Amino acid sequence: MSTLITNIAELMTQDAEHRVLKDAAVVIEGERISWIGPSSAAPAADDEVDAGGRALLPGWVDSHTHLIFAGDRTAEFEARMAGESYSAGGIAVTTGATRGTSDFDLTRLALGRVAEAVSQGTTYLETKTGYGLDVENETRSARIASTVADEVTYLGAHLVPAGADADEYTDLVCGPMLAAVRPYVSWADVFCEQGAFNEQQSRRVLQACKDAGMGLRVHGNQLGEGPGVRLAVEFGAASVDHVNYLSAADVEALAGSWSGWQGAGTRGTVATCLPACDLSTRQPLAPGRELLDAGVPIALASNCNPGTSYTSSMAFCVTTAVLQMRLSVHEAVRAATYGGALALRREAGNDVDGERAVGSVAIGHRADLHLLNAPSATHLAYRPGIPLTHAVWRAGVRAR
């Protein structure tokens, strides 16, 4: 089955040449993109969709979410809005609610959140464990996550449970818990922050998970300067997320991890910015402009979670990046598409063949497409808060 999407006013490919095509057309063949070019030269297809002069983008790639949970934390949110500062302790509230919820209901809730994200243009997403915090419930979360998300990350090292010894809990994370979740996950993460896991504990988690053959990610530098960025670069993590508080040495280390990379070769560590979380916690926005200017690739992600960023709107993140972080529209869209793919090692090139590539529109790539109800992507920031998703294709299937 083939589908021709024609009369596209603006096609932001996010391919290697960063091409933006005008009056364009795209052909989907099965799950893949089979043709791109001018509307006037478009081939026939089994089905035809008139884009009506709208803009077409790659689907959003949301590389940082926490979707496996029950309950909410509205009381914590209200307290924070009243002036209380954010700390990681609220994670325990969600852990209690999640442990008390059945597999069926956890799956139902997670699927609802995925559907909400897809309806807004997200076509590829990662999610984490981290609200189980014991072997049984982390394994349960990992298993459920593997049925609802494209990429699953083990975050047993999210918070030390109340009453537990931090080093003994780290032993558990690196031993029995890791062994139990491993069949369901491909990534591992650690919350390297004051009040969560210190440098020594974080190093142990990263080493154990690396030895288990997992890709690495780090929650780092959210609440203050610390060792998170340095550890992420040292261990070759795919991304370090939050990055609100960076020293000059942190920025230099991130930039240095990409030295010599020109779309091929050894990748460095992506800096993943989470602007919706920054606004909700009233933290300084991550320095996306400064990172880009220093040569550090960035990703934008929703950090959808019940405590600090209960949104799946990648468009909101793009809008915030443009209006508050001083990114151009093109830079923000790229960070929310290709940048997310790079943070998940799913960008085209290197060891990723075209059929596995996401975050860009190119022949042979997965047909993840987001049609806006606007003539250009500029409208995402120009008309903030307006729902502009008109149609979505996920792996070639019309999802909206």
UniProtKB/Swiss-Prot annotation:
<feature type="binding site">
    <location>
        <position position="307"/>
    </location>
    <ligand>
        <name>N-formimidoyl-L-glutamate</name>
    </ligand>
</feature>
<feature type="binding site">
    <location>
        <position position="131"/>
    </location>
    <ligand>
        <name>N-formimidoyl-L-glutamate</name>
    </ligand>
</feature>
<dbReference type="GO" id="GO:0008270">
    <property type="term" value="F:zinc ion binding"/>
</dbReference>
<dbReference type="InterPro" id="IPR005920">
    <property type="entry name" value="HutI"/>
</dbReference>
<dbReference type="InterPro" id="IPR011059">
    <property type="entry name" value="Metal-dep_hydrolase_composite"/>
</dbReference>
<feature type="binding site">
    <location>
        <position position="73"/>
    </location>
    <ligand>
        <name>4-imidazolone-5-propanoate</name>
    </ligand>
</feature>
<keyword id="KW-0479">Metal-binding</keyword>
<dbReference type="InterPro" id="IPR032466">
    <property type="entry name" value="Metal_Hydrolase"/>
</dbReference>
<dbReference type="GO" id="GO:0005737">
    <property type="term" value="C:cytoplasm"/>
</dbReference>
<feature type="binding site">
    <location>
        <position position="305"/>
    </location>
    <ligand>
        <name>N-formimidoyl-L-glutamate</name>
    </ligand>
</feature>
<keyword id="KW-0408">Iron</keyword>
<comment type="pathway">
    <text>Amino-acid degradation; L-histidine degradation into L-glutamate; N-formimidoyl-L-glutamate from L-histidine: step 3/3.</text>
</comment>
<comment type="function">
    <text>Catalyzes the hydrolytic cleavage of the carbon-nitrogen bond in imidazolone-5-propanoate to yield N-formimidoyl-L-glutamate. It is the third step in the universal histidine degradation pathway.</text>
</comment>
<dbReference type="GO" id="GO:0019556">
    <property type="term" value="P:L-histidine catabolic process to glutamate and formamide"/>
</dbReference>
<protein>
    <recommendedName>
        <fullName>Imidazolonepropionase</fullName>
        <ecNumber>3.5.2.7</ecNumber>
    </recommendedName>
</protein>
<feature type="binding site">
    <location>
        <position position="64"/>
    </location>
    <ligand>
        <name>Zn(2+)</name>
    </ligand>
</feature>
<feature type="binding site">
    <location>
        <position position="64"/>
    </location>
    <ligand>
        <name>Fe(3+)</name>
    </ligand>
</feature>
<feature type="binding site">
    <location>
        <position position="66"/>
    </location>
    <ligand>
        <name>Fe(3+)</name>
    </ligand>
</feature>
<keyword id="KW-0963">Cytoplasm</keyword>
<feature type="binding site">
    <location>
        <position position="222"/>
    </location>
    <ligand>
        <name>4-imidazolone-5-propanoate</name>
    </ligand>
</feature>
<keyword id="KW-0369">Histidine metabolism</keyword>
<dbReference type="GO" id="GO:0005506">
    <property type="term" value="F:iron ion binding"/>
</dbReference>
<keyword id="KW-0378">Hydrolase</keyword>
<feature type="binding site">
    <location>
        <position position="219"/>
    </location>
    <ligand>
        <name>Fe(3+)</name>
    </ligand>
</feature>
<feature type="binding site">
    <location>
        <position position="308"/>
    </location>
    <ligand>
        <name>4-imidazolone-5-propanoate</name>
    </ligand>
</feature>
<comment type="similarity">
    <text>Belongs to the metallo-dependent hydrolases superfamily. HutI family.</text>
</comment>
<feature type="binding site">
    <location>
        <position position="219"/>
    </location>
    <ligand>
        <name>Zn(2+)</name>
    </ligand>
</feature>
<feature type="binding site">
    <location>
        <position position="131"/>
    </location>
    <ligand>
        <name>4-imidazolone-5-propanoate</name>
    </ligand>
</feature>
<keyword id="KW-0862">Zinc</keyword>
<dbReference type="GO" id="GO:0050480">
    <property type="term" value="F:imidazolonepropionase activity"/>
</dbReference>
<feature type="binding site">
    <location>
        <position position="158"/>
    </location>
    <ligand>
        <name>4-imidazolone-5-propanoate</name>
    </ligand>
</feature>
<dbReference type="GO" id="GO:0019557">
    <property type="term" value="P:L-histidine catabolic process to glutamate and formate"/>
</dbReference>
<feature type="binding site">
    <location>
        <position position="66"/>
    </location>
    <ligand>
        <name>Zn(2+)</name>
    </ligand>
</feature>
